[in-house]
Amino acid sequence: MEEYLVPTAFGEAEFVEKKSRFIGRVWPVETEEEALAKIQEMKKQHYDATHNCWAYIIKDGAVRFSDDGEPGGTAGMPMIQVLQREGLNNIVCVVTRYFGGILLGAGGLVRAYTKGAKIAVDAAGKSMKRVWDVLYVPCPYTYYERIKLEIEAFGGVLRDTQFGAEVELEILLPEALSQSFLDRLTDMTAGTVEGLHTGQEYRAFPV
């Protein structure tokens, strides 16, 4: 299965440029229908806005954008370029503009819609969708902190920790790195700590 970046969650941010108010929003979506539904939702919510420009990218599917009445190439295209530069898939972005009475010009509009998309993406965060190996690792307390550092070094996620006679860890690691991680634990602890592979999951985690 492929690895690809998606937005972690809904993200929203806004700014004012020469009295025009710009509100940028992004959502994670799985289908073009979901993306179009979000766009329609924003058009209804901001029916009084001057423009509701949008862009979306669906993995192995549609790439679409709209200037929604702004001069051609000044809104939707800059927004889609932000999403592409950020490497994101399964994402829809809407930038709403309330006109403030001062014209921005073509260059100013491109900069404003680029900024609107970028700050919304930053607010949403990024997650990597990939195959993760699920590992069960029981360890003595003396190794707990060192193992946490190794999990981080290998790009893993410590999902659950149980404290009893020893520490029991549930760890998710990128599929390609899990065996190297287990080998590292064996070497680091002189064989004291051994992990078990308990399954796999295909999901996204923040990066």
Q: What are these model-predicted stretches?
A:
Residues G61, P71-L88, F163-A165:
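Positively charged, aromatic-enriched nucleic acid-contacting surfaces
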Residues I147-E152, S180-T189:
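Short amphipathic alpha-helices in soluble, non-transmembrane regions
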Residues I171-S178:
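Terminal, non-globular segments
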Residues L158-Q162, T189-P206:
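Conserved short beta-strand edge segments in small beta-sheet-based binding/regulatory domains
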Residues M77-A123:
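Active-site beta-strand/loop microenvironment that shapes enzyme catalytic pockets
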Residues M1-G73, L196-F205:
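C-terminal regulatory domains involved in ligand/effector binding and gene-expression control
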Residues P138-G156:
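Short amphipathic alpha-helix segments
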Residues K126-Y143:
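Short glycine-/aliphatic-rich beta-strand segments at the starts of folded cytosolic domains
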